[in-house]
Design a protein with these regions (language model features):
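Catalytic-core segments of nucleotide cyclases and related cyclic-nucleotide turnover enzymes
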Residues: 246, 264, 278-315
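Conserved hydrophobic beta-strand signature of PAS-family and PAS-like sensory domains
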Residues: 38-39
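PAS/PAS-like sensory domain cap-loop motif
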Residues: 34, 43-60
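Signal-transducing coiled-coil linker helices
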Residues: 9-12, 16-27, 105-155, 162-173, ...
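Terminal output helix/cap of sensory domains in signal transduction proteins
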Residues: 64-103
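A short pre-motif secondary-structure segment
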Residues: 224-227, 268
Length: 315
């Protein structure tokens, strides 16, 4: 069917047809006017972002709502805004970004922005479709299985230390038998004691959940992210080189720094220090984790909020 005939067909439908259509989609769909205020927010957008339509209609998407960032943690709302690019080019603008969920963690999405024209051919609005491509799509079943086997950290809803220990033992066996490389990232929250002292343990627990969900949402489905200790997390990354491990570590670090917990009067954010290392053939479970932890402590010594993959410097 041609575009002209399709337009004629739409003109003959009920006024709420498009709204019903968009609300039937699992993908997020929203529309902005020329001032970049949100004028429509579908049910898919509610499910993916956690924000109900009533909380976002009439607001700018940069008003501490989605706040798109790239994999380097750079906010796109000013210089790289998909809506601005679409209004200027009057064409579809696809891309990837990390949006801010209502709970404060970062979520990877594929985004496609497109112009909406009036009858005179002028762009009067911008539509955006965003698709969640995080492993959390598979999480409900996985979380139930982990909880059944007592391998789930109930406070953060990610894998617990027992699961991570079993996972690392399996990865070491695979590496030695099949030469499959993998790396470990040891993560510690910076200044967590001060945060708890200032805002209370309940807020501190929310920050830990924010970090846990950012990690779990931004690794591949065959990688593993979990809670190691009170304010420590561990990520195992499969089939990876040293350079790629450094890139993944810094991406996760930057995404955490661009996340926040929302209180009534302020937004609480934090940074993390990381140690990243590839597993070696001579490694035991203990030696691998110890080396990653020592590299994390090296990041602390260098000033925090960084990744160390060697003791000569930090990335």
């Amino acid at each position: 069917m041609s575009g002209h005939r399709f337009s004629e067909l739409l003109n003959g439908t009920k006024p709420d047809f498009l709204e019903t259509l968009f609300n039937s989609l699992e993908n997020g769909v929203y529309f902005l006017d020329r001032d970049k205020r949100i004028i429509f927010w579908n049910r898919g957008a509610e499910l993916i972002s956690g924000y109900p339509a009533a909380e976002v209609i009439g607001k700018h998407c940069s008003d501490k709502l989605l706040v798109h960032v790239d994999d380097k943690g750079i906010v796109q709302c000013k210089d790289f805004c998909p809506a601005d690019r679409t209004f200027k080019s009057e064409t579809v603008f696809p891309g990837t970004a990390y949006i801010l969920h209502k709970e404060g963690y970062r979520l990877p999405v594929n985004v496609s922005a497109f112009p909406v024209f009036d009858t005179a051919g002028r762009p009067v609005a911008c539509g955006q479709v965003f698709i969640d491509y995080s492993p959390r799509i598979l999480m409900p079943q996985n979380l139930q299985e982990l909880e059944r086997m007592s391998l789930l950290d109930l406070g953060t809803q990610v894998a617990n230390r027992q699961f991570l220990e079993l996972h690392l033992q399996s990865r070491l066996t695979e590496m030695k038998r099949f030469k499959l490389p993998f790396g470990v990232i040891f993560i510690d929250v910076d200044n967590m004691a001060k945060l708890n002292e200032r805002h209370g343990r309940e807020v501190g627990d929310r920050v830990l959940r924010m970090i846990a969900k950012t990690l779990a949402s931004n690794v591949r489905f065959f990688d593993a992210a979990g809670r190691w200790d009170r304010e420590e997390f561990l990520v195992a990354v499969l089939n990876i080189s040293e350079a790629k491990l450094d890139m993944v570590s810094n991406k996760l670090r930057l995404l955490i720094s661009q996340s926040h917990v929302s209180l009534e009067a302020e937004f609480i954010s934090c940074t993390v220090s990381m140690g990243a290392t590839l597993a070696r053939r001579e490694d035991t479970f203990e030696s691998l984790v110890t080396r990653a932890e020592q590299l994390m402590l090296h990041s602390k010594w260098l000033g925090r909020n960084r990744v160390s993959s060697s003791f000569k410097g930090a990335k």
